[in-house]
Each structure stands twice: as structure tokens, then as C-alpha cells.
Amino acid sequence: MKSQIYSMQSIEDAKICLEAGADRIGVLASERCGEFPCEVKEKDAYEIFRLLDGKCTSILISVGRNEEEIFHQLEYLRPNVLHLCANYTGSPSFREHMREKFPDIELMEAVGITTREESIKEALRVAEYADYLLLDSVSATVKGIGAAGVT
């Protein structure tokens, strides 16, 4: 079993997670000034990712709105995995472009669990191009998929 911990706010948070044995650590990097409660500035995310280099799998939780914005983050931050959620939905062509520019970065996409039929259909669609699926909760009051406190 792998442990995955998200929403690092500081290098200190990341150090504690590493010491606790986390296998995968995620950071939501954004310059949107508080649109998401767990976001950190890209410069802070950069420092966290450098701390994680070679110690665990680093995951960029991107809330980028388009391919250009997301690729800019990948170029600067260089995580092991890109996790798409909230503002952008991947596609086979997005994954192809990503493989061309960033062959060593894997893609994870969140699939919101709603109804059984819709969720399975969406998971099968995303599985065509994503390296990982994250099956997650959906809330009417929280933007995007996950971090909703719904279990």
C-alpha cells in the first residue's frame, strides 16, 4: 500500500510527511491568491518539490485553466506526477503533448464519484490516457473534485 498526502503548505509540513514515511506528497501550486484554501505560491511549491527530489513521489495538483498554463508549471516545478483537477480536464491529445514535452512526468486525473453509471463511464474515458485515476468525492459547495470532506 502507498500513502499519499496532499495539501502541503510549507517545507516543514513536507518534512514531517517524509519523516512519517509518506510515499507520495502533493502540493496545489497557484498564483490565484486564495481561490483554493490549500494553495501555495509557485515559488514555495518549487522549494517543497526540491526537498522531495529522490525521497518520495512529488505531485503537482494543478488548477491551471489551459495547457499553456499547466505546461508552464511543469517546466518550472518539475514534479514526478501532474494531478489534473478543478479547472482543466485532460484528453488523449493533452497527454500526447505532455509526453512530448515532459516524458518523465506521469499524469493523474481525478474522477468524481457521482452515480455508479456516470462514474464508471468517466473512469473508462480518463483511463484511455491517464497513468493514474484518483476516484474522489464531489461536493456541491467545493469547486472541483476532491477535498470535499465527503466520505
PLM region descriptions:
Residues M1-T151:
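Conserved N-terminal beta1-alpha1 strand-loop-helix module at the mouth
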